[in-house]
From Swiss-Prot:
It comes from Catharanthus roseus. It catalyses: loganate + S-adenosyl-L-methionine = loganin + S-adenosyl-L-homocysteine. Disruption phenotype: Large increases in loganic acid accumulation. The keyword Methyltransferase applies. Expressed in leaves (especially in leaf epidermis), flowers, siliques and stems, and, at low levels, in hairy roots. It comes from the Eukaryota. This is Loganic acid O-methyltransferase.
Length: 371
């Protein structure tokens, strides 16, 4: 049975959704200056968006997509730019081209969504002056509703859904089989830890889909890009991202050995991230039953063919992790930590150049089912 808007039971609003925005501002350590890999994902996804609009977006004689009314687009997990602007322009251009083939031209309204402590000031200061859309910011967790029912025609989410709403409680419980002592992630850990992370991802992704099912119009599209695994047979520990997480943990332990932080603070720190396989994603979408999977696959990323760059990688990881690390350990550890981290990256250069090829930038094209 196809789920209807009114039959979808929304998950309860989380009592404590963790928010870990990317490093704000526009200095040398900011996310806006250190997100070229993420831009590569968006550039690679442009062809996917063009094809999805051309083949899957039914505009002709469809009152849901009346060109007299604005065509509304939402970017969930927009961060601080400029990548979100590239993604939104790709969508606007694709939809506009299709409307023009029907001799129609709507106005476009783009909504930029992220947590309330995202640096929206930097985002809106850098809005393209010649943009072809009206812009608005929408603060709030995308794991819950942030828009009215049937209000969004095209949803987009890039490199955001691997961030969990919270760390799985089992891995912080000393009496649990999943207690993750001495590690900051599920890289190379026991199966109980991996299971706890996947369980949290499953709950979060289901909440995301339920919320979007209420907000997206029937026939509306959603394109998702997420770092993940090409299949369930590939271990996260055998990927470049897995090695990045592992070395961040070992770098923190070096600070413990130097007496800069204590071991208990590392034991109580875990990264709220899960990198899913295609099978993980398909399972949750099919259980949700509100969207059809129009396309799923792996994006070709141009940087995968470049030599591993230690300094650039260290800066990118710092831009992503600085806020969550500062919140737990304080900002005084950042410089010594990333000095050690850069050294560890250099020492493992040969491993990265091989393992990073096993990472997968996954994409999904989903279409909202009819009631």
């Amino acid at each position: 049975m196809v789920a209807t808007i009114d039959s979808i039971e929304m998950p309860a609003l989380p009592t404590a959704v963790e928010a870990h925005p990317m490093k704000g501002g526009d200095d040398s350590h900011s996310y806006s200056q250190n997100s070229c890999y993420q831009k590569g994902v968006i550039d690679a996804a442009k062809a996917v968006i063009v094809e999805a609009v051309n083949e899957k977006l039914d505009l002709e004689n469809n009152p849901i997509f009346d060109p007299i009314k604005p065509f509304r687009i939402a970017d969930f997990g927009c961060s601080t730019g400029p990548n979100t602007f590239h993604a939104m322009q790709n969508i606007v251009e694709s939809v506009e081209t299709k409307y023009k083939s029907l001799q129609k031209t709507p106005e476009f309204h783009v909504f930029f969504n992220d947590h309330v402590n995202n640096d929206f000031n930097v985002l809106f200061r850098s809005l393209p002056p010649n943009r072809e859309f009206f812009a608005a910011g929408v603060p709030g967790s995308f794991y819950t509703r942030v828009f009215p029912k049937n209000s969004i025609h095209f949803a987009h989410c890039s490199y955001a859904l691997h961030w969990l709403s919270k760390v799985p409680k089992e891995i912080q419980d000393k009496n649990s089989l999943a207690y993750n002592k001495g590690r900051i992630h599920y890289t190379g850990t026991e199966k109980h830890v991996v299971k706890a992370y996947f369980g949290q991802f499953q709950r979060d992704f289901e909440g995301f889909l339920k919320a979007r099912a209420q907000e997206i119009v029937v026939g509306g599209l959603m394109v998702i890009q997420i770092p993940g695994l090409p299949s369930g047979e590939v271990l996260f520990s055998r990927t470049g991202a897995g090695l990045l997480h592992f070395l961040l943990g070992t770098s923190l332990m070096e600070l413990v050995n130097k007496g800069i932080i204590n071991e208990e603070s590392v034991d109580s720190f875990n990264l709220p991230q899960y990198h899913p396989s295609v099978e993980d994603l398909e399972m949750v979408i099919e259980m949700n039953d509100c969207f059809t999977i129009e396309r799923v696959g792996t994006l070709p990323h141009p940087m995968k063919n470049l030599p591993f760059d230690v300094q650039r990688t260290s800066l990118q990881v710092r831009a992503i992790m600085e806020c969550i690390l500062t919140e737990h350990f304080g900002e005084n550890i950042l410089d010594p930590l990333f000095e050690i981290y850069t050294k560890n990256l250099q020492e493992n250069f040969h491993v990265f150049d091989k393992e990073i090829r096993k990472d997968a930038d996954l994409y999904l094209v989903l279409k909202r089912k009819g009631n």
